UniProtKB/Swiss-Prot annotation:
One of its GO terms (biological process) is translation. Belongs to the universal ribosomal protein uL3 family. Transmembrane segments: none annotated. GO terms for molecular function: rRNA binding; structural constituent of ribosome. InterPro entries: Ribosomal_uL3, Ribosomal_uL3_bac/org-type, Ribosomal_uL3_CS, Transl_B-barrel_sf. This is Large ribosomal subunit protein uL3. The gene is rplC. Methylated by PrmB. It comes from Pseudomonas fluorescens (strain SBW25). The modification N5-methylglutamine is found at residue 150.
């Protein structure tokens, strides 16, 4: 896995090319990612870099976390993320920002999707509705049969039914980086990314583009 960064979703807008073509983009703020720990095969059994981003009040930091951040000589952040590494070398206190990406590069963006609460099968799984007329009554949005009879005598695991929708980890792959604004720590990515405005995002070089 290649090094990535943790950012914050700012929202969507559009930019225009020199030919006048409108491109919808998501603006991602890449605050400086502070390295809190560099893991090696000798000490941890694998190579990885651990980063934190943002700020957190001292009253919200546990004693163990405070000691970990103090050892790395970095300020406490709102979240901690780890990236596996195949090569490269980092030291605690190093900064990683949007400059590791370039315009035209493909990236994978991971975030938590918007929570929709408890939803029925039509919204959750795109089931079709039943007839509005022809004798149908009070069953316009019900899923219908969910199984068989005495054999097997149960509902199979994984059956698509009503339930909680959204609020889960989602990755959108191979999005194009349209622009990198290193001065303002902004990354403009073509298209939409998961989650609500203000949510944390993990941006990595695209897995499928790395071969």
């Amino acid at each position: 896995m290649t090094i990535g960064v943790v950012g914050r979703k700012c929202g969507m807008t559009r930019i225009f090319t020199e030919e006048g073509v409108s491109i919808p983009v998501t603006v991602i703020e890449i605050e400086p990612n502070r390295v809190t720990q560099f893991k090696t095969e000798e000490t941890d059994g694998y190579r990885a870099v651990q980063v934190t981003v943002g700020e957190r009040r001292a009253s919200r930091v546990t004693a163990a976390q405070a000691g970990h951040f103090a050892k790395a000589n970095v300020a406490a952040g709102r979240t901690v993320m780890e990236f596996r590494l195949e090569d490269g070398d980092y030291q605690a206190g190093d900064l990683i920002n949007a400059e590791i990406f370039a315009a035209g590069q493909l990236v994978d963006v991971t975030g938590q999707s918007k929570g929709k609460g408890f939803q029925g099968t039509i919204k959750r799984w795109n089931f079709r509705g039943q007839d509005n007329t022809h004798g149908n009554s009070v069953s316009h949005r019900v899923p219908g049969s969910i199984g068989q009879c005495q054999t097997p005598g149960r509902v199979f695991k994984g059956k698509k039914m009503s339930g909680h929708m959204g609020a889960e980890r989602v990755t959108v792959q191979s999005l194009e980086v349209v622009r990198v604004d290193a001065e303002r720590n902004l990354l403009l990515v073509k298209g939409a990314v998961p989650g609500a405005t203000g949510g944390n995002l993990v941006v990595r070089p695209a897995a499928k583009a790395r071969g």
